[in-house]
């Protein structure tokens, strides 16, 4: 049976991978993002050019416009069965660099934006539905210089655990996927910053990063999509409040 799905940050990277997997399973998918062009490109690459899917430009940090976009999806689809809160940003932010504005931007997007997305979707989400939050392995441990990012991703796991209890009476499950290094533009930008900060080549920085990954490679966005799709399946109906590390073995707890 086709599911009605909402995916934020669906225009690139992990979000695009999630969209491909869900659409490939026969689901109707609505993708949201700040820029319309990447969203349309993602849909155009789907089987049938995403004829049963839709794209809407929306910023998860802007509650009113986000709620309007989600309501449009809910009305068009006649409700929602799946909400995937994937939109997020990365980059460095330590105690002193680059300052409180960057902290606010990262936490506002990653943590607040996820909460705003779920709040906007709940009136349209059917009982027995699924919520999947994309956190990170940096939600499981800390990294110096990435204070805001780590804090926001840790916060998402706490949000998942609390919401899982709040929404259990409706039969709605809430889980998180915590990716490690995934082959995306965001990950490449992170490795470039790592190379610059350690004064080594990009190739060397990439090699050092992947040395901490037992399988020795970056994951593909569609692999993360497969984890999300499973959490939305009947087989995962008994799982809620969990954070699954999908990271090639970099984290084993």
What residue spans do the PLM features occupy?
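Conserved glycine-rich cofactor-binding loop
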Residues: 11-13
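Short C-terminal tail/terminal secondary-structure segment
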Residues: 141, 217, 228-229, 240-253
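Short, small/polar-rich loop/turn modules that mediate ligand/substrate recognition or access, typified
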Residues: 84, 168, 173, 239-241
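Active-site helix of classical SDR
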Residues: 118, 152, 160
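Residue(s) in the substrate-gating loop at a strand-loop-helix junction
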Residues: 136
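Alpha-helical segment proximal to the catalytic Tyr-Lys
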Residues: 123, 165-166
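Substrate-binding pocket helix/loop in short-chain dehydrogenase/reductase
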Residues: 94-107, 209
